[in-house]
Amino acid sequence: MDYEFLRDVTGRVLVRMSMGHEVVGHWFNEEVKDNLSLLDEVEQAARTVKGSERSWQRAGHEYTIWIDGEEVMIRANQLDFSGDEMEEGMSYYDEESLSLCGMEDFLRVVAAYREFVSKA
């Protein structure tokens, strides 16, 4: 999972992720922004569920993050509909709307993001 941190002309941090993990970048850009307390909450949840059968999720404005003992899933809230609403032959998966990654990989990105932001 490759990533890049940039600053736009206003100084806002932007995250770009490799193909297949774009939604992780969108989550940072839309939900985290400068809210490092959200990252505190996510890291605490990851420690709580790691190695267990439990899971944790937090719905944001645009994206929901879901963590279990091994992986992290981030999905666009627009995917939050029942199967009855889906047209036949349609799939929930959309690279722009859903991403899965290992918990350790995700936590490495969180740590790198914190480091980048602190270098303001």
From Swiss-Prot:
Any S-S bridges, and between which cysteines? none
Source organism's superkingdom?
Bacteria
Signal peptide (residue range): none
Entry-linked InterPro entries: UPF0231 (IPR008249)
Q: What's the short name of a Pfam family annotated to this entry?
A: UPF0231
Q: Which NCBIfam families match?
A: PRK05248.1-1 (NF003574), PRK05248.1-3 (NF003576)
Q: Which family does it belong to?
A: Belongs to the UPF0231 family.
- Name this polypeptide is given: UPF0231 protein YacL
Q: Tell me which species this is from.
A: Salmonella paratyphi A (strain AKU_12601)
Phylogenetic classification of the source organism: Bacteria, Pseudomonadati, Pseudomonadota, Gammaproteobacteria, Enterobacterales
